[in-house]
Amino acid sequence: MNWEITTFIAYFVILLGVALVFYFNGTNKNSEDFFLGGRSMGPWVTALSAQASDMSAWLLMGLPGSILAFGFGQMWIGIGLAIGTAANWILCAKRLRTFSKAANDSITLPQYLTNRFAVDSRALQLVCALIFLFAYTIYVASALVAGTSVFTTLFPDISPKIAMFAFLLIIVAYTFFGGFAAVCWTDFFQGLLMMAALMLVPIVVYFGHSELLDPTALETVYEYTDAATGAVTQCAFGGGIFNASWQDIVSGLGWGLGYFGMPHILVRFMSIEKPSMIKKSSIVAIIWVVISLFSAVMIAYFGRMIMGEELLTHGNQKLVFIAMSRKFFPAGICGLLLAAIIAASISTADSQLLVASSSFTADLYKPFFRKGASEKETLLVGRVLVLVLSLIAFAIANSKGSGAQAIMDMVENAWGAFGSSFGPTILLSLFWKRFNYKGAVAGVVSGFVVDLGWLLTGLTASTGVYEIVPGFIVSFLAAYLVARFTEAPNAEAVAIFEEATKPDAD
């Protein structure tokens, strides 16, 4: 019996079981239950589900692989994400929970941005919903590609299409049946698994196999040739963390700005049972991020000294976690550790799928097509859309055309687009009483345009500065200046602000 595969499969059977429990016990009675868990999530579930949905397989493959190949200068993105995570929990979490409740009990971010200013216009809600629907469908397609890549690496005898379809079925099943609550609970356990897996590998290496650590490997320059292009890449570990260029440092730290506008993370703040629970959630989330990122760095550091030549001469740096797990753990435990990689991929994909579905039903279907739709109908449409978006994402991910490749390339910039478009607007809506609807529209539109323009004109490549940095700055200035020099918000919007910022708001 192959214990690695058996353990791997058993883990996902348990995940599906969780979804079925939520489905058959009648947890999802209405759209707020399905899309926001009835605002009943506890502090631990809120914290770990938010972090698991944030950190995809990049945490276990991309980050350690990059550091393994090029040294500690690659850590700046991780540092930016850690700072951004902490700032998001400290600045936004509690306020967004109270503001979304005060703003007509909003269950999506586009709905919140409209209700927050108490206006009749649905233009901003429409624009935001369309951006969400498009971007998150592509995001899910990207997650399918990433998950399939991991799946076929672990199980090379399985064809990519079968692997992708199996991966899709797992995601769709517990999203469709379980809704937000099931997604949060499964992401909670997956968050624990991801952190445990990341911690266990360097601990076992350091305390059990330190004799294998070869410091000279840090000085050796390895190189590999890309089979497709013939390009030769040299992998020098380089100097310390400050060996990076100023552009890499600014761009890496700029990644942290994305959190303020990332819907599938912000919606976790809206779902917690009580605002007073946010403090505990914040502590848990920040500790999780610091430990997980530090562990990923140590995996790369130890991996370079133990199997740098084996991995880097073949361009397999992203497989360092897999290789270390298989080298130092028995098959049963290894299967669980490898499940953490797939868990990281699906914990991101399921959240994005649910946000896209909720945005369609709450921000497009009900306001524009079926204003009188019942809760039962809305819930059904949401579930159907989970299936539809999944199939579209599957088709995109399976496409071999250049157009599909261009779309997949755009996904890498979606984080910047969300952060630039929505980050400043969300922050100002939570902290500035004078902020108004026109300022919000200006912030969203200008941030998106500058972010996209910076990318399409080649400025990201020529300057080396990540597009979220200028996009966020321009969006913030536009939102502030337009709101400052246009009419003040109406009395209802001011009342919402005052209600949400009361000292006893809970």
What does each model-identified segment do?
Residues 1-506:
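Membrane-embedded helix-loop-helix hairpins and adjacent transmembrane boundary segments
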